[in-house]
Amino acid sequence: GPPNARQMLERLDIDIIWLPNLTKPEELLSSIEMVSERLARAEVAEALIEDVNRGLIQAAANSSNWAEDAPTVLFLLEPPGKSTSGMGGGLNSKADTLIFLAGGKNAATEFSGFKPVSTESLVAMNPDVILVGQSDRHGGSPESIQAMIATPALSEVSAIEKGAVYAVPLDDLAFGPRL
């Protein structure tokens, strides 16, 4: 979370386990181990780690089917609007990891983390698939997604031409045991 929130919690003088901001599945496994150590629940952690590893192996096996012809995928936290940029997940982001685990190639290779994505840059990326994160409080609204799809400047983007624009739960970026 924000640094000021962490500082406030540290002042409470209570035992807190600080976990890193996860961007890769391996980091999830080490976080599970950290928590289990502090809670003295190694047996529970072992079972959970085995379950997560099974899921990762299955995801890798499923995604290997796409290896040569993997679609390019753009994950947007917010789609670009008429006068605003959207927010896209570049390399070394949770979005990048999810795209990889699903068997795709990240279309946003020009930057790392989450950065603004303009209409022009979306045209240049020309992804085969666009995923737009949604939640109750954040992400693209159904209206903003429809507005993006209806934007004339984006009409020749492959994902829009093929109708391959999907709303996905923004919670998918919260790497936890259900990864």
Model-derived segments and their meaning:
Residues N4-S83, K105-E110, I160-L179:
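Extracytoplasmic substrate-binding proteins
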Residues F100, T109, V117-E120, M125, ...:
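Small-molecule-sensing regulatory modules
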Residues K82-G86, G139-S141:
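Short acidic/glycine-rich loop or secondary-structure boundary segments that cap or lie
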Residues M87-F114:
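Alpha-helical, coiled-coil/dimerization segments enriched in small aliphatic residues
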Residues A67-P71, L101, A124-N126:
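Short gly/pro-enriched beta-turn/loop segments at secondary-structure junctions
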Residues G1-R38, K115-S158:
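Acidic/His-rich segments in extracytoplasmic proteins that coordinate ligands and/or metal ions
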Residues E33, E50, E78, S93-F100, ...:
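Internal, well-ordered alpha-helical scaffold/interface segments
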